[in-house]
């Protein structure tokens, strides 16, 4: 489990394979609507992923996408065509995820931003309204709704814009909503509302910490190198810095560490000096303690 980087700071075990960060359900809807998100344990077992729709094989960047309650993402047009082809009397449990066979329709008592976003898509088609227990739409209403893109309910909280930066093999590409303008910028996720409009060229957050944050033990950029293999020198340095780092730990811990290290160093020094001194006197003692000395014969 990890902590999401959004202002809500929620604890979650869901992990974005593309950006390699922990994400909560609010971030899935607002900042990662087309990213591959599964559990962190699944990412540890296999970090490879394909950012394509499993129904049509094309990239998820093309067209509107919908995320099911199992967190699998598909093109809405592909999923709608697949489920609409089923018989009209298909039970709600018969509509299942193409990837994991989990029921598409969320439970009525489920409180989830992902479920709310999914319901907004399902309410646009008759097979979805049938599973949700809503009244069916007429042909005129269904045709008019096809021209209107479904709006995600949670996007109302973001009044100005939501920027999501995706890293591809050819470089970095910025996708801006809702106008869809593309530009090149460094990787980050910025959420800005109408109450705090950004200045020209300045997209920094207006929040300032009350107290200056200390650099974490083991490096300043922990998110980029926390999955790299550590060398023995780095592990030893990290272990020793825990005793020297100024924090709320009791002061006697540092003193105990210094005293213990000094005693061990002194014992090691005495042992080495005794071993070296005993090795030089062995040759002399062997001649005096030999009961049958052999005289040297000179020719």
Swiss-Prot record:
Zinc finger (B box-type): 1-43
Family: Belongs to the ZFPL1 family.
PROSITE patterns in UniProt: ZF_RING_2 (PS50089)
Subcellular location: Membrane
A Gene Ontology cellular-component term: Golgi apparatus
Membrane protein topology class: Single-pass membrane protein
Alphabetically ordered keywords of this record: Membrane, Metal-binding, Phosphoprotein, Transmembrane, Transmembrane helix, Zinc, Zinc-finger
Main location: membrane
Region (Disordered): 200-231
InterPro entries in alphabetical order: ZFPL1, Znf_RING, Znf_RING/FYVE/PHD
Phosphoserine modified-residue sites: 215
Zinc finger map (RING-type): 53-101
One GO MF term attached to the UniProt entry: zinc ion binding
Residues passing through the membrane, by range: 256-276
Domain of life: Eukaryota
Name of the protein: Zinc finger protein-like 1 homolog
PANTHER family: ZINC FINGER PROTEIN-LIKE 1
